[in-house]
Design a protein with these regions (language model features):
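Catalytic domains of carbohydrate-active enzymes, especially glycoside hydrolases
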Residues: 8-30, 89-94
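Hydrophobic, well-ordered secondary-structure elements that form the walls
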Residues: 17, 128, 219
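Aromatic- and carboxylate-enriched substrate-binding clefts and catalytic-loop regions
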Residues: 29-205, 209
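Long hydrophobic segments that form regular secondary structure
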Residues: 194-214, 218-220, 225-226, 259
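Glycan-recognition and catalytic regions of carbohydrate-active enzymes
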Residues: 229-260
Length: 260
């Protein structure tokens, strides 16, 4: 969930994660620069220089004291330019890994780039998940620290479009999910009907029931599951205990029934 990135604000998120047994927190932009610039003008930014307001080394120390580890969001162009310096620094800070975004290609050059970056991340014991990514092709078999990747129209689209329909979410297990883990970001708790739904950047809604969103944690495959809503949406709500207790991976899945 994107939010104001200063030290006190992120402590709030770390505390929520710790209180609810969530192992990881992802720092989105603008941890190293303003959000618009980090996304649209990556060449102007340096992912080894966090903004002062976040007090990043101290934030890592605080997260560690709460048994929460952090992933750092990065634009792929910055990673391409700075991985040799940034990855050892991220490891020194204590980062669990990186979320790399906005590749938006699957040509041969980019596929080779994925492999190169995964090798570099492995050298520094950093886990990886790709956003703005192409569909999986079995790469996680060679690089098990690749946890998941997007390549799917997920819940974030509810902020700006009407595209994440119930029909779409019910079809994914039979289509996109067949090729590998997908970072759909389930767990929206502002559940509404088709008639009530509207795109909302600040308090995104999701179509369908609470149970529909919770079922995604079981049916959708992703060893790293995101909890997509904000703490205020979850507190004292039915379903939070399920999210706290459901595992993200298991040894065997038995399909009882399912068809399109």
């Amino acid at each position: 969930m994107a939010s104001k990135l200063d030290f006190e604000n992120q402590k709030y998120y770390i505390d929520f994660a710790s209180d609810n047994g969530l192992e990881y927190l992802e720092l989105e932009p603008p941890w190293y620069g303003d959000e618009d610039g980090a996304i649209n003008r990556p060449k102007e930014y340096d992912i080894t220089k966090p903004v002062p307001e976040i007090q990043l080394p101290a934030l890592f120390d605080y997260a560690r004291s709460k048994n929460v580890r952090m992933f750092l969001w990065t634009h792929w162009e910055n990673v391409n330019r700075q991985a040799d310096v940034a990855f050892p620094l991220f490891a020194k800070w204590g980062a669990a890994g990186v979320k790399i975004d906005f590749m938006n290609r699957d040509d041969q050059e980019m596929v080779k780039w994925y492999h190169m970056i995964l090798k570099k991340a492995a050298e520094h014991h950093l886990m990886v998940f790709f956003h703005g990514a192409y569909k999986p092709t079995g790469t996680q078999r060679t690089y098990p620290h690749l946890l998941t990747q997007e390549g799917v129209l997920g819940n974030e689209q509810n902020k700006v479009t009407y595209l994440c329909t119930l029909e779409h979410t019910m079809t994914l297990p039979f289509t996109r999910m067949l090729v590998g883990p997908m970072d759909f970001t389930p767990g929206g708790f502002r559940n509404v009907t088709v008639e009530q739904f509207r795109p909302d950047m600040n308090q995104p809604m999701v179509l369908g029931t609470r149970c529909h969103q919770l079922a995604m944690f079981v049916v959708y495959e992703s060893p790293l599951m995101m909890v997509c809503d904000d703490p205020a949406a979850y507190r004292n709500q039915p379903g939070l205990e399920f999210i706290k207790n459901v595992p993200s991976s298991w040894d065997e899945t038995k399909v009882i029934e399912g068809k399109i």
